[in-house]
């Protein structure tokens, strides 16, 4: 559900057996063979619907009350007051290693966490283990969960941290292990009661073991948005499919987590707010995107400021131009998704960095208005910072990866990875990288990721990972034949059988790119993600509209597959060591 910020409660809608890369790398012919085999468990919606749900958008009175509480969570002054209260309660109390100060999710940022604080007489490192749960009736067994908290690996006498991974609606037993500098360890325990989950997600996902013996990568799977018609959360699941975190957000999606390096994490919490949550669970910064609405993705630049994909130009004149193109009344906003803004994390200032309409004016002018009344002519869904004013952008509507340089000066196209037929007559034909080999081109790709290599980046060669939705369609350009992207590309949504996790090598010296790795996965015409995980070149691929994600080994064999009963789809799944 997309909620307006503040206390305004008005709501509006937005948006089995898996095959190895050995066969997929056979090119278009191999891809067609895979398509003929079919994939089990693929969820297919109507063309252009994005799998929209018919569920009611009405919240219960309890959910409305909870949403007001969630809005209050992202108020820095209120969070500061909570921290001051915790400090006072701790100072008043006689707490110790044997009887630590414990508060269950005092900041309201993770239902399955608690705040812990105590002192020791000697300098020790600290770790903790959350006890498991035995299987009883329909309640599944839950394994133990162990972590070293932020700063816990540094010997100290004062200890303040967050415990994560608690079991919902359960009296959790937590064991603390303190290790002295001579190596001697001692333990103490406490219990903390958690409430039931606040959202409607599953406590336990359905998990199917794959044929690979490669261990799953460490970390937690972050479900970064489901576009529910109810309340919105970021969910964290462990490798067994057990929920280990429930982070409430005001609305929309959390998109991805960014880590400044101080133990905190930064994520979007609504269409106009980014938030920073420190290692103890306290919201310490909230940045507004001002006259812009964020969407899809964001990244750090070299100075640690936020580059955010955005819609709606700040000036009324720019808005009028887009409204006129979309034939909308002056009072209506029009989503264009063609801007990159910068949010200064020190001052909070917001500035426009890139307007893609200025770079591709003829393309924008040729685009048709979408059925929802928006001018979604380029639909940027990923941004990757390469350093030195250079970014990679993923354009779903043009099925093109775009490299821009000098974004803080004169933004310039360095190269395009897309269809030569689509870009014919655009004036950017010379910017196209030439595909080497026999493979269908990307169609509607998402989750583009820059994978530098110390040995090759300096020579102008690097890898690009992405989720190829393999769905050629764009309301903005109805006359273009997307079948020209290759024989394997799906142009009829109802006939989609598979998408791909793909890795390309881009060579800027020869102005070419080649497909070096590919995994065929359940079809998802929209949303979805791919990520390189662990130390063994495994790939995590989420097919959002199929509501499934799988971790594959380096040979393309599935290690484990997870299924989620999302209302619409899973927007994106990334794995983080939290």
Question: What is the meaning of each model-derived region?
Answer:
Residues 137-154:
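Solvent-exposed serine/threonine-rich low-complexity stretches and specific carbohydrate-binding patches
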Residues 57-133, 155-160, 164-171, 175-578:
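Histidine-/acidic-rich catalytic cores in large beta-rich domains
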Residues 26-27, 50:
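Compositionally biased non-globular segments, especially hydrophobic aliphatic-rich helices
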Residues 45-53:
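Bacterial Sec signal peptide processing site at the extreme N-terminus
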Residues 1-19, 27-38:
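N-terminal secretory signal peptides
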């Amino acid at each position: 559900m997309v909620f307006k910020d503040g206390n305004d409660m008005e709501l509006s809608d937005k948006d089995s057996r898996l095959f190895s890369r050995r066969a997929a790398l056979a090119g278009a012919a191999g891809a067609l063979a895979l398509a003929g085999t079919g994939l089990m468990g693929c969820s297919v919606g109507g063309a252009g619907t994005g799998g929209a749900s018919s569920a009611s958008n009405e919240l219960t009175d309890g959910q409305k009350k909870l949403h007001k509480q969630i809005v209050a969570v992202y108020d820095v002054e209120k969070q500061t007051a909570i921290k001051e209260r915790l400090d006072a309660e701790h100072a008043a109390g006689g707490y110790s290693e044997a009887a630590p100060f414990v508060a269950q999710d005092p900041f309201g940022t993770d239902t399955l966490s608690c705040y812990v604080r105590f002192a020791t007489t000697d300098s020790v490192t600290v770790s903790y283990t959350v006890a498991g749960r035995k299987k009883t009736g329909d309640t599944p067994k839950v394994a133990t969960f162990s972590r070293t908290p932020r700063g816990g690996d540094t010997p100290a006498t004062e200890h303040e941290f967050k415990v994560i991974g608690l079991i919902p609606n359960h009296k959790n037993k937590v064991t603390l292990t303190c290790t002295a500098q001579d190596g001697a360890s001692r333990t103490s325990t406490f219990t903390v009661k958690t409430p039931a989950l606040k959202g409607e997600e599953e406590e336990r996902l359905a998990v199917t073991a794959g044929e690979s013996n490669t261990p799953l990568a460490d970390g937690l799977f972050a479900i970064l948005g489901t576009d529910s018609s109810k309340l919105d959360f970021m969910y964290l699941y462990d490798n067994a499919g057990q929920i280990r975190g429930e982070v409430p957000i005001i609305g929309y999606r959390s998109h991805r987590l960014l880590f400044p390096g101080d133990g905190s994490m930064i994520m979007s919490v609504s269409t106009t707010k980014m938030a920073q949550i420190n290692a103890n669970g306290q919201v310490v910064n909230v940045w507004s995107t001002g006259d812009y609405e964020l969407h899809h993705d964001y990244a750090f630049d070299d100075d640690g400021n936020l580059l955010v994909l955005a819609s709606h130009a700040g000036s009324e004149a720019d808005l009028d131009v887009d409204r006129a193109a979309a034939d909308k009344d002056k009072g209506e906003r029009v989503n264009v998704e063609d801007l990159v803004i910068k949010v200064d994390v020190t001052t909070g200032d917001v500035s426009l960095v890139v307007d893609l309409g200025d770079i591709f004016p003829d393309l924008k002018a040729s685009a048709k208005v979408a059925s929802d009344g928006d001018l979604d002519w380029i639909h940027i869904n990923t941004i990757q910072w390469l350093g030195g004013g250079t970014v990679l952008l993923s354009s779903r509507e043009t099925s093109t990866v775009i490299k821009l340089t000098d974004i803080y000066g004169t933004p310039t196209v360095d190269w395009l990875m897309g269809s030569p037929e689509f870009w014919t007559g655009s004036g950017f034909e010379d910017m196209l990288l030439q595909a080497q080999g026999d493979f269908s081109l990307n169609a509607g790709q998402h989750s583009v990721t820059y994978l530098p290599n110390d040995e090759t980046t300096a020579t102008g060669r690097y890898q690009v990972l992405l989720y190829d939705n393999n769905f050629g369609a764009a309301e903005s350009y109805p006359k273009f034949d997307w079948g020209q992207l290759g024989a394997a590309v799906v142009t009829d949504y109802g006939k989609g059988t598979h998408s791909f996790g793909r890795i390309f090598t881009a060579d800027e010296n020869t102005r070419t790119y080649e497909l070096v790795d590919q995994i065929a996965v359940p079809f998802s015409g929209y949303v979805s993600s791919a990520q390189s995980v662990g130390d063994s070149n495994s790939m995590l691929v989420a097919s959002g509209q199929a509501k499934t994600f799988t971790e594959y080994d380096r040979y393309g064999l599935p290690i484990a597959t997870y299924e989620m009963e999302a209302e619409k789809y899973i927007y994106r799944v990334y794995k983080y060591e939290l």
